[in-house]
């Protein structure tokens, strides 16, 4: 603590007699580039990317086959859209009430 108290009265730049502005190397604008690291030891073999070679010839598992059968109509990816079949599948008593509500919502737009 006493060493800090003595140096606090004098700024470090004036004590050394060197202005801080001139740096040993002028830096360029933007993000500094990453320093190249020298390889140490054996280089590790790169692992192949993507699908393994023989994976397409295998038959799907039983769980995957059940899942494929369980899913009905295949829908496209992305934002879910309203499909007209959903309205047809509902009970006739509910359809009448939905038709009136759908007409009201159409008038609001």
Swiss-Prot record:
Residues 95-109 have a biased composition (Acidic residues). GO terms for biological process: adrenal gland development; astrocyte differentiation; base-excision repair; cell division; cell proliferation in forebrain; chondrocyte differentiation; chondrocyte proliferation; chromatin organization. GO terms for molecular function: 5'-deoxyribose-5-phosphate lyase activity; C2H2 zinc finger domain binding; cAMP response element binding; DNA binding, bending; DNA-(apurinic or apyrimidinic site) endonuclease activity; enzyme binding; MH1 domain binding; MH2 domain binding. Residues 24-34, 44-54, 71-82 bind DNA. Residues 15-25 have a biased composition (Low complexity). Its main location: nucleus. The modification Phosphoserine is found at residues 44, 101, 105. One of its GO terms (cellular component) is nucleus. Keywords: Acetylation, Cell cycle, Cell division, Chromosomal rearrangement, Disease variant, DNA condensation, DNA-binding, Dwarfism, Growth regulation, Mitosis, Nucleus, Phosphoprotein, Proto-oncogene, Repeat, Transcription, Transcription regulation. Transmembrane segments: none annotated. InterPro entries: AT_hook_DNA-bd_motif, HMGA, HMGI/Y_DNA-bd_CS. The modification N-acetylserine is found at residue 2. Residues 46-56 have a biased composition (Basic residues). Interacts with E4F1. Interacts with NEK2. It is linked to Silver-Russell syndrome 5: A form of Silver-Russell syndrome, a clinically heterogeneous condition characterized by severe intrauterine growth retardation, poor postnatal growth, craniofacial features such as a triangular shaped face and a broad forehead, body asymmetry, and a variety of minor malformations. The phenotypic expression changes during childhood and adolescence, with the facial features and asymmetry usually becoming more subtle with age. SRS5 inheritance is autosomal dominant. A chromosomal aberration involving HMGA2 is associated with a subclass of benign mesenchymal tumors known as lipomas. Translocation t(3;12)(q27-q28;q13-q15) with LPP is shown in lipomas. HMGA2 is also fused with a number of other genes in lipomas. Belongs to the HMGA family. Functions as a transcriptional regulator. Functions in cell cycle regulation through CCNA2. Plays an important role in chromosome condensation during the meiotic G2/M transition of spermatocytes. Plays a role in postnatal myogenesis, is involved in satellite cell activation. Positively regulates IGF2 expression through PLAG1 and in a PLAG1-independent manner. This is High mobility group protein HMGI-C. It comes from Homo sapiens (Human). The lineage of its organism: Eukaryota, Metazoa, Chordata, Craniata, Vertebrata. The gene is HMGA2.
